[in-house]
Amino acid sequence: MSNVAVVGTQWGDEGKGKIVDLYTEKADIVARFQGGNNAGHTLVVKGRKTILHLIPSGILHDNKTCVIGNGVVFDPLVFLQEIEELQQGNLLPPHTKLFISERAHLIMPYHRSIDQAREARTSGKKIGTTGRGIGPAYEDKVARTGIRVGDLYEEDLFRDKLRQNLEEKNFLLTNYYKDKPLDVEEIATQYLSYGQKIKPYVADTSLILDFEIKQGKKILFEGAQGSHLDVDHGTYPYVTSSNTVSANASCGSGIGPNTISTVVGICKAYTTRVGEGPFPTELKDDIGNHMQQVGQEFGATTGRKRRCGWLDMVLVRQAVRVSGISALAITKLDVLSGLDKLKICVGYESASGQFTYAAPASMRVLSECQPVFEELDGWKENILHAREMNDLPVNAKKYLKRLEELAEAKIVLVSVGAGREETIVLEDPFHK
């Protein structure tokens, strides 16, 4: 058995889409296990950019099975739009199967309304939500008032749940947020129609995955966001509303944890963050601008500029520990080309002058921490055509070696450009 989970080691946007796309060639099945359409995976195939927010990145490969697991919050409109875009671009392979868990919770219009109204009202203390309704959908799931994909096929049950939910949500929208109420019948008609359109894809995906595992098939579990956006282990409250670490690959897919043999952590060669929250190594100078412009650091979902800074190995080490990462894939190494000096954060110094290798849980304490850097020499060479480690400049290899030492995890892949072919593959995680 050789099943692989891929998770981000930072605040998302690490380049997971490209890596998942590459690893899909070795896998039989690709499964999304958490999040929703608040994350965007950017893929470049044959010079064409494709951004997927909900459908697993493996959809571009033929003879694969793609699964949207029970841990995902599912927006049927976004799903149907992505299917249509893939069909129009002639990007849907003829023999690839796609399934949606009947247990996945639906993102409803009132989730989006509340998400946006809440963020607009929160003056000075914004979380930086995408406004896609992800958080409110997870809130309803935990509160046991959520509506699941499978409920769309029991019309009386669906209407009853919707009516009860809207009674509460409309009261909140009109009386607290001073927003417009939503119409029960309009939503019911809309979502029941969605239900019929997505029906061919809906299944008990836990059973499908279990069957395929017993047949010896290889599964790639695709995480969204990054470890430090995890609702438990991230920079709370500046986090997403789900568990983004590897342990949720099991829970969010409906299979046992012993079925996952390898966890690959995706680590950008520098650090970025979208939205609010502490960022100890953030650069607001020419180097930060270089990273932002050369790396094209704009959110795939929101289009917002990403904040950029030096690589923070305190955060990466924590991600390695929490997710049990044994293999690292380094992305966007090419963005650092041309910089005279490179810095790596190896620890923090607190406001009281104490040195620590670990990130504090308190956001106040973290925001007061100063990064402690190691400095390395950079390189001038263009590395886009590197296909083996020996093709890289000496200083690039030294940089990677130091990252490996600090993370205490082996580098198995280095991405030197956006294209599939612009990659140095050192090990196949499916053959461990």
Describe each region flagged by the PLM.
Residues 1-432:
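Non-transmembrane, aqueous-exposed alpha-helical and coiled segments at domain scale
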